[in-house]
Design a protein with these regions (language model features):
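Cytochrome P450
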Residues: 2-12, 106-113, 172-183, 193-218, ...
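N-terminal membrane-proximal hinge/A-helix region immediately C-terminal to the signal-anchor transmembrane segment
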Residues: 2-147, 152-159, 180-191, 226, ...
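Cytochrome P450 I-helix active-site segment
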Residues: 68-72, 178-182, 233-242, 276, ...
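Cytochrome P450 heme-binding Cys-pocket and its upstream "meander" loop
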Residues: 87-94, 320-331, 435-451
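Hydrophobic mid-domain F-helix/FG-region of cytochrome P450s
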Residues: 109-122, 146, 186, 202-227, ...
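Cytochrome P450 core scaffold surrounding the K-helix E-X-X-R motif
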Residues: 121-126, 225-226, 360, 435-447
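Conserved cytochrome P450 catalytic core segment spanning the I/J/K helices
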Residues: 169-170, 175, 251, 271-348, ...
Length: 451
C-alpha cells in the first residue's frame, strides 16, 4: 500500500497546507519513505513583512542600551518566510545552533525571545499565572475559543479545569476505548482496504484527522460526525479557523479587532462563517443533550459515573448539575473539539510516518500488538502491556512534539535563569522541538527504543 503523509508542523497556529511524503512498498508488509521535508522546491508561501520593517522593529524595540544579555538573531526575509509559512520548528532549530539556547527574533512588527533551554522553560512555565500569561495565543484565538479553557487565564481556567477533569475517569476511558476508539479505528481500516488492494496513495494526515474528529464527536458529544465516509463541513470550518488564527499572529496590524473591517474583508468573513458553523454544531448538541437529561431527571450518584446510553463528557457535565452558562459550556467543549482532534491526529501521523521509515521497529510493534491482543479488539487495560508501541509513540512525541512551540507573555519584568532580562509585555516562544533535539541534552535517541 502507498501512503501519502502530511508532515508539516501540525501546530494549532500552522498555515494548513500539507507537505506530502509518499511511501512505496518495496516488499510486502514494510514501507519505505521519501521525505519532502528536504525538498527545497516544495516551500510554502506566506505573506511576511520586508527586511526593512524587521530591522526597524529590532532597532525600536531594543535600542542601543539593551542590557538583556539575549543575543539577536539576524533573520533575512527568506528566513522569516520559512518561519511563518513553513514548518515552524526548522528555522528556530537553525537559529538555536547559531545563537545558543536563548535568542531574540524580530519578525516584522513583533519580536520574540526564543527559549531552547530546559531551565528557562521551566521557569517561565512554573510562573504561569504569576509572571506569565498566554498572551499572543489568547489574542489571536479568542474569536474561535471564546472563554474556553484552551485560552482561559487565572481563576476562570482553574474553575473550568476542575469542572471538566472529573469526567475523564478510568471507567469513562475504558468504556470509550471499547465503544468508540475501537469501532472508529475499524471503520478506518475498512475504508483503507480498497486503496491497499489497488496500491493507491493515501493522505494519512487527512484520514487521521477524520478519524480523530469522529472519536471526539462520540466521546465528547455522543455525536457521530461520520467524517471518514462523508464530507464534513465541520472539518473545513476547523481548518479555516485555525488558518485564520495563524494569519493573525503575523499580521502587521491587528485590524481584525475592528468590527467594521471584519464585516467587509473577505478573509474575516470566511473565518466568521467557519466559527459560526462550529459553534452552531456544538450548541445544537448541547441543547439536545440538555433536553434528554432534564426529561430523565439524571444526576451523578457516584464518583466514576458513566451513562450507559450516552457515556460522553457532555452528558457527565450536564448530569453534574454545575451552575455554568450555555456559552461557557459551549466554549469549553469547543476547545476539546478543535484542539483535541488536531493534536491527536498529529501524534498518529508522525508515529506512522516514523514507523514506516523503520521496518524493524514496525515489525516489532506489529508483533507486540499480535501477541498482546491475539486478534481481539484492544481494551484500556491492554495499554500497560503494549510497552514497545507506547515507547514508539513517546519517541514520536519527542522527535515531533505537538505543539512544537509554546507561547507565553511576560506580565512583569523578570530575570530568567542565566541572568537574561525580559521586559513586561515580552512574547516568549518556548521551542519544545529544540529542547528535545539539543545535542547538549541527555535525551533518548530514536535508536534507543530497545531500552
Amino acid at each position: 500500500m502507498s501512503l501519502t503523509f502530511s508532515v508539516s508542523s501540525l501546530h494549532p497556529l500552522y498555515n494548513y497546507k500539507p507537505i506530502s511524503t509518499t511511501t512505496l512498498p518495496p516488499k510486502p508488509r514494510f514501507l519505505s519513505i521519501k521525505s519532502s521535508l528536504d525538498d527545497e522546491t516544495q516551500k510554502q508561501t506566506s505573506w511576511v513583512s520586508p527586511d526593512w520593517l524587521t530591522s526597524l522593529t529590532r532597532s525600536l524595540s531594543l535600542g542601543r542600551n539593551d542590557d538583556s544579555g539575549i543575543p539577536i538573531a539576524s533573520a533575512k526575509l527568506e528566513d522569516v518566510s520559512d518561519l511563518l509559512g513553513g514548518a515552524l520548528f526548522l528555522p528556530l532549530f537553525k537559529w538555536m545552533n547559531d545563537y545558543g539556547p536563548i535568542y531574540r527574533l524580530a519578525a516584522g512588527p513583533r519580536n520574540f525571545v526564543i527559549v531552547s533551554d530546559p531551565a528557562i522553560a521551566k521557569h517561565v512555565l512554573k510562573n504561569y499565572g504569576i509572571k506569565y500569561a498566554k498572551g499572543l495565543v489568547a489574542e489571536v484565538s479568542e474569536f474561535l475559543f471564546g472563554s474556553g479553557f484552551a485560552i482561559a487565564e487565572g481563576p476562570l481556567w482553574t474553575a473550568r479545569r476542575r469542572a471538566v477533569v472529573p469526567s475523564l475517569h478510568r471507567k469513562y476511558l475504558s468504556v470509550i476505548v471499547e465503544r468508540v476508539f475501537c469501532k472508529c479505528a475499524e471503520r478506518l481500516v475498512e475504508k483503507l482496504q480498497a486503496d491497499a488492494l489497488n496500491g493507491n496513495a493515501v493522505n494519512m494526515e487527512e484520514k487521521f484527522s477524520q478519524l480523530t474528529l469522529d472519536v471526539i464527536g462520540l466521546s465528547v458529544f455522543n455525536y457521530n460526525f461520520d467524517s471518514l465516509t462523508t464530507d464534513s463541513p465541520v472539518i473545513d470550518a476547523v481548518y479555516t479557523a485555525l488558518k485564520e488564527a495563524e494569519a493573525r499572529s503575523t499580521d502587521l496590524l491587528p485590524y481584525w479587532k475592528i468590527d467594521a473591517l471584519c464585516k467587509i474583508i473577505p478573509r474575516q468573513i470566511k473565518a466568521a462563517k467557519a466559527v459560526m458553523v462550529i459553534r452552531q454544531t456544538v450548541e445544537e448538541l448541547i441543547e439536545k443533550c440538555k433536553k434528554i437529561v432534564e426529561i430523565e431527571g439524571e444526576k451523578i450518584n457516584e464518583e466514576e459515573y458513566v451513562n450507559d446510553n450516552d457515556p460522553s463528557i457532555l452528558r457527565f457535565l450536564l448530569a453534574s448539575r454545575e451552575e455554568v452558562s450555555s456559552v461557557q459550556l459551549r466554549d469549553d467543549l469547543l476547545s476539546m473539539l478543535v484542539a483535541g482532534h488536531e493534536t491527536t491526529g498529529s501524534v498518529l501521523t508522525w508515529t506512522l510516518y516514523l514507523l514506516s521509515k523503520d521496518s524493524s521497529a514496525l515489525m516489532k510493534a506489529q508483533e507486540e500488538v499480535d501477541r498482546v491482543l491475539q486478534g481481539r479488539p484492544p481494551t484500556y487495560d491492554d495499554i500497560k502491556d503494549l510497552k514497545y508501541l507506547t515507547r514508539c509513540i513517546n519517541e514520536s512525541l519527542r522527535l515531533y512534539p505537538h505543539p512544537p512551540v509554546l507561547i507565553r507573555r511576560a506580565q512583569v519584568a523578570d530575570v530568567l535563569p542565566g541572568n537574561y532580562k525580559v521586559n513586561a509585555g515580552q512574547d516568549i516562544m518556548i521551542s519544545v522541538y529544540n529542547i528535545h533535539h539539543s545535542s547538549k541534552r541527555s535525551l533518548l535517541s530514536a535508536v534507543n527504543l530497545e531500552t
